[in-house]
């Protein structure tokens, strides 16, 4: 029984282990021959990676490769492939291909869905890069035969990684244009690109070169080369053409009996075939056929000169058409130089005997005579006078057609500003740049315009900030003007005196509890020490009547004296105490001097009790316009009464209309002596 349980537990353990261990993916039944299909790692869904040892299996597959798990990558490296045809078209879901370490010279057709492509260690040239898919994201082109970068690379808008090292890169103006696009798109390069050409920049990174400098240098180098050729007096292409003409003419004229193919060259001045000669535009090849048949008739019997002249005269129209064509080609500046070389030798041209034979000046007979008379071919003057396009007589008047629009463009410099009339693939508008160039050049003007706009925006923000700063400072300055004005800090309009309050005691001065709502005397400040305050009167001289009332502005009694406190310390019911400063005021010697002399020497308003009034504003408790003791009251000079010393007065009007002001005499209490004892 125990053995049965042990076997059951062992079987259960094996089942659990088998389920927990990941089994390798099966090779699909439809996997191509010579290929291994494996499950890719680090993918969200199952995808197959195809590793092939040859392309035989993919070529034998007639239809699209189908399997339950799609194939997203393939490895065809180290197979010595020279060309890749439509093999990758059979894998529609392919996104990555490794074609490295082959001998590929042409890519063929690649899938449009490719995202990653490895082409290092191949033999690809720059022209083959135009066939690359435009949706590539990662491209490796190391160790190839790439010399420059075509503008078609700027169409790969999804490209974010590119490798171009170990290539003989020519850092030309066009290549640097593509470089600017790559830098603008922030395309990552692990290995730097080193320039191989121009020679003066060999070994330098292409990031160190400026496109404007290279473009200008290429243009200047071309102009310098053209000037040097002009200074030499000849152009290489024209000189070589003239020498070849002389050699060909010598070969044609030296042999008396030659084959028709050799004699056919005399009809047309031999030179390098031009595009205008190859494609005439008329579509008629009859002239070419007649040109080939003409030597057969003239060279049939080389010894019979007279018969050949008759045959040549019998068909003048054929020769006339060809001569006109040859003359047009020479006049178009093809570079043969035949006309320019014959002009200095008119005498030598007239020596020939063919001119005397043909009285009408027909060039056909003169063109045929050198073949009949080999003795005349030895004279170089005779050869050049009749074979390079210089005709005597009135042959120029017999031009049946004029083809001035056909201009040879062999010597046209494509880098100069000259317009070209040659049509290669289709109609080209020289005033418009191609879309590739516009796409590649759109980066730099955009950067310049955006930089200008950013600069203007920054300047505008600075100006607006300065204006706001000045405005805020100005507002703060205006708002603090009142705070800086000492007289304008606490402005309170002085109201008219309420005469109903006069005569009331202090504790009933308009308030039931005898307390002021706000203190009339503020805190002592530094200005208090600067005020000139009269020294208090002596105790014996300070006599304040019991019925005298203080002023409402808090300046105390009229004479500025203080009430002597009773000895018992208990004030009488009818006594009041004027408001005195909280802190002792400094005594001035001048104030004390005036206080001692005012009782004897002065009388105010003819009153005997005028001693209680100060003789001078400086000696009494004079309240100026602004005082720390009355800081919250502002009195204007035009509103202050005369005399300025506050006192209790009575005003009356005389018969003459004058106002008479009389100070009220203080009432001396009768009980003051009793309380003193």
Curated annotation (Swiss-Prot):
LRR repeats lie at residues 91-116, 118-133, 134-156, 158-183. Residues 374-385 have a biased composition (Polar residues). It is a single-pass type I membrane protein. Plays a role in negative regulation of the JAK/STAT pathway by binding to the receptor dome and promoting its internalization for subsequent lysosomal degradation, thereby reducing JAK/STAT signaling. GO terms for biological process: negative regulation of receptor signaling pathway via JAK-STAT; negative regulation of stem cell proliferation; positive regulation of endocytosis; synaptic target recognition; tissue homeostasis; trachea development. Residues 595-607 have a biased composition (Low complexity). Disruption phenotype: Homozygotes are semi-lethal with a few escapers displaying no visual phenotype but showing disruption of midgut homeostasis under normal conditions and enhanced tissue damage-induced midgut regeneration. Interacts with dome; the interaction promotes internalization of dome and its subsequent lysosomal degradation. The chain crosses the membrane at residues 452-472. This is Protein windpipe. It is found in: Cell membrane. Its main location: membrane. The keyword Transmembrane helix applies. Residues 347-372 have a biased composition (Basic and acidic residues). Residues 473-677 are cytoplasmic. In adult intestine, expressed in both small progenitor cells and large nuclei enterocytes (at protein level). During embryogenesis, restricted to the developing trachea. Residues 21-451 are extracellular. It comes from Drosophila melanogaster. Keywords: Cell membrane, Glycoprotein, Leucine-rich repeat, Membrane, Repeat, Signal, Transmembrane, Transmembrane helix. Residues 264-285, 298-317, 325-385, 502-523, 539-677 are annotated as: Disordered. The keyword Transmembrane applies. The gene is wdp.
